[in-house]
Swiss-Prot record:
The protein's name in its UniProt record: Pentatricopeptide repeat-containing protein At1g77405
NCBIfam families in the record: PPR
Keywords: Repeat
Organism: Arabidopsis thaliana
Intervals holding PPR repeats: 164-198, 199-233, 236-271, 282-316, 317-351, 353-387, 388-419
InterPro entries to which the protein is assigned, alphabetical: Mito_RNA-Proc/Resp (IPR051240), Pentatricopeptide_rpt (IPR002885), TPR-like_helical_dom_sf (IPR011990)
Pfam families reported for this sequence: PPR (PF01535), PPR_2 (PF13041)
Keyword Kinase set for record: no
Domain of life from the UniProt record: Eukaryota
Lineage start: Eukaryota, Viridiplantae, Streptophyta, Embryophyta, Tracheophyta
Family the entry assigns: Belongs to the PPR family. P subfamily.
Keyword Cell inner membrane: no
Length: 458
């Protein structure tokens, strides 16, 4: 019989509490556990809960994922991080604020739990639970334990069904996200040891991890290997999209003009090679290249790609139009940006969102066109969107400086304040600890009298 969801939650809480209290996983704990029978979902829930209590510090609760960081991801060096912690130097990146002692306890308890349910309850681990345990060891930076665990599990009778290509691919993705790209590459080359054969998804995963740290030479080597005549797993559209997107993003992150020119040239060359080999670019491929061209002031090439995608029947979406709107807003070609937004709505290619209106409003305010900025804010709110706190304050200040403060309806003010306050409350539930002022700042100011509201600027 499958345990109910409230019962599963109680069991997870009970086991996590036992881990925090450092209680041994023995027959005494087994007798007090009411999970009969154990299910794969319940075991996965326990393993997924361990990082939240042992790997994450209060200061990093609610932090953005690595792919949202502006700075390029770098290959992590555990010995260097350990030296920095001993010297009380701030460690940045995925390993920030991790307490090695807590992580070690969490890994120890996770392994005890993994083998405890086998011994006392006769639970047969499958591919999913072994994959979750391997990813847990990777997130805890225990690579020796990870290799030993995979070797031990793969040598079992059902080892071929437990350690599969899909599970190794998921592990490589986890290692890449944590900044351990060399370890992910080592896992890729160890697949044969675990009786697995890499497929196109495994190649795409390791190429993506290599591109994230800027190792394009190795990524191109793997792509060339996939392009060999008769290779079992040739590249697909996603393989080329990974490289095109990475060339554009990594070039802009370096901040070097020469590097930007080189990377954009490589991205366009990869796009032409993709067409030459008979692959059809999708909207994601076009969006990556168009966004890179817009952000590097290559608007002619971006418009050429835009027309090309429409000619080939690839329908642009909101992301495509937002790239042009941001470019036109930054260069003060506001009429072009507004025309792009109206075209998107007219052709039904997307619905304007906050990321569409915000650059337009900021550009109008900077060019002292507060009345038009106010009209866009009204249109935005009537569409069910809430402007950012900074955008709201910017428009209010611009209207006041031009003597148009009374033209914005009080009911509209109220709706925006309520939306801002609701969003602020949601953020506070996700990230209750705001120790770093560059992450979240709170401002209190008055608008139209005695009403205060908290403004969060990210």
């Amino acid at each position: 019989m499958k345990p109910s969801q409230p019962l599963c939650n109680r069991i997870v809480d009970q086991l996590i509490t036992a881990m925090i209290q450092n209680r041994p996983f023995d027959a005494v704990l087994a007798s007090s556990t009411v999970a009969k029978p154990w299910t794969q979902q319940l075991v996965s829930d326990v393993l997924h809960s361990i990082p939240r209590f042992f790997f994450i510090s209060p200061r990093s609760i609610g932090r953005q994922k690595g792919f949202r960081h502006r700075s390029p991801l770098k290959q992590r060096n555990l010995s260097d991080e350990s030296q920095r912690r001993r010297s009380e130097v701030l460690v940045l990146g995925p390993g920030a604020y991790m307490d090695p002692k807590k992580v070690s306890i969490g890994l120890q308890k996770a392994l005890e739990f993994f083998f405890w349910i086998e011994t006392h309850f006769g639970f047969d681990h499958n591919e999913i639970t072994c994959r979750d345990m391997a990813c847990l060891l990777a997130k805890g930076n225990d690579f020796k334990g990870l290799w030993d665990f995979l070797r031990q599990v793969s040598r079992r009778e059902n080892g071929k069904n437990v350690v599969t290509t899909a599970s190794i691919t998921c592990l490589m993705k986890c290692l890449g996200e944590e900044g351990f790209v060399k370890e992910a590459l080592a896992t890729f080359y160890r697949m044969k040891e675990y009786h697995c054969k890499p497929d196109v998804y495994a190649y795409n995963t390791i190429i993506n991890a290599l591109c994230r740290v800027g190792n394009f030479k190795k990524a191109r080597f793997l792509l060339d290997q996939m392009q060999l005549p008769g290779f079992r797993y040739p590249p697909d559209t996603y393989t080329y999209t990974i490289l095109i997107s990475s060339y554009c993003r990594y070039g802009m992150q370096t901040g070097c003009r020469k590097a930007i020119r080189r990377r954009m040239w490589e991205a366009n060359r990869m796009f032409r090679e993709m067409l030459f080999r008979g692959f059809v670019p999708d909207v994601v491929t076009y969006n990556c290249l168009i966004d890179g061209c817009c952000k590097t002031n290559r608007i002619g090439r971006a418009l050429e790609l835009f027309e090309d995608m429409k000619t080939k029947g690839c329908v642009p979406n909101q992301v495509t139009y937002n790239s042009f709107i941001r470019y036109y807003s930054v260069t003060n070609e506001i009429e072009g940006a507004i025309e792009m937004m109206r075209t998107m709505k007219k052709l039904g290619h997307g619905v304007p969102g906050s990321s569409t209106y915000t650059p337009l409003i900021h550009a109008l305010v900077e060019t002292r066109r507060a009345a038009e900025a106010r009209d866009l804010v009204v249109e935005m709110v009537e569409a069910g969107l809430v402007p950012r706190e900074y955008t709201y304050k910017l428009v209010c200040d611009a209207l006041s400086s031009e003597g148009l403060a009374s033209t914005l309806d009080e009911e509209l003010h109220k709706r925006m304040r309520e939306g801002i306050q609701q969003r602020y409350s949601r953020v506070m539930k996700i990230k209750p600890t705001m120790a770093r002022k560059e992450v979240v700042r709170k401002y209190f100011h008055k608008i139209d009298g005695n009403q205060n509201f908290a403004m969060e600027e990210i």
